[in-house]
Amino acid sequence: MISYAALASSTESRVSTLGWRYYRPMALPDYHYLYDHACERKGGEKALKALLPKTKSKAQLKKLGSDRYLAEFTRKIFQSGFVWRVVDKKWPQFEEVFWEFDVERLLMMPDDMLERKAQDPAIIRNFSKVTTVRDNALMIDETERREQRSFGEFMASWPAEDVVGLWLYLRKHGSRLGGNTGPFALRTLGVDTFLFTQDVEGFLRSHGIVDGGRTSQRALKAAQAYFNDLREQSGKSLAELSRIISFCHGQNRVQ
């Protein structure tokens, strides 16, 4: 089988700068096969449609304040490696302790105040994660200054066919937003993105689309190329396609 991973390094001349659109080997599952298989595993088309995620429009993403982006980045950072429901239960206290994630106010927070907040029993006391609040507030502020537009406008303008580029941006410029943390935050915010869940990664590997480290640029480009291809076939969002694939492989979980 010809793998997308191999194509990602051997067919650069076929790539459009934005979308990494490689030739699609015919042996790979097409959208109709995936959709029918997911319907079968979830108990029918109606049941499947009810489980597909929704994304926000570009207009909605533009209107979303920088405080909401920072809040969701922070929530996902604290949920990483922890019990999600505990973070969710304490979230109103997080909002209070961090001034509803007011970026400008957080940027003025001195180190000693940051240390005190990290010891506040109202939230989860993890100093290294608490420091990301100010670090990511700085990332948002610097992005807005460089781009001369709001962070919401910046996020909304990023093309879905290069969403892994946005993952890489958050990984490079943000704090603790690498791995699945950044992508999961984007999904929750309503940005159209696929996810490297265990089932999705297993599917991509089993079909030779991805090999090696999943966070390598080669793997990300190969995965993006396959999802772009499915998107062109179906007209579905990356988020919907990711969920459909997750139902076609492994433990058939909603992720």
Segments predicted by a language model, with ranges:
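Non-catalytic, well-ordered alpha-helical scaffold segments
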Residues: D67-A71, P92, F127-R134, V164, ...
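Short linear/disordered segments characteristic of secreted peptide precursors
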Residues: A8-S9, Y22
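N-terminal polyanion-binding entry modules of DNA glycosylases/AP lyases
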Residues: G19-N126, V130, I244-Q255
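Low-acidity, Ser/Thr- and Arg-rich intrinsically disordered low-complexity segments
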Residues: S3, S9-S16
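Alpha-helical ds-nucleic-acid-binding substructure associated with the helix-hairpin-helix region
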Residues: W99-R176
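C-terminal accessory module of base-excision DNA glycosylases/AP lyases that mediates lesion recognition
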Residues: G19-K54, Q148, G152-Q255
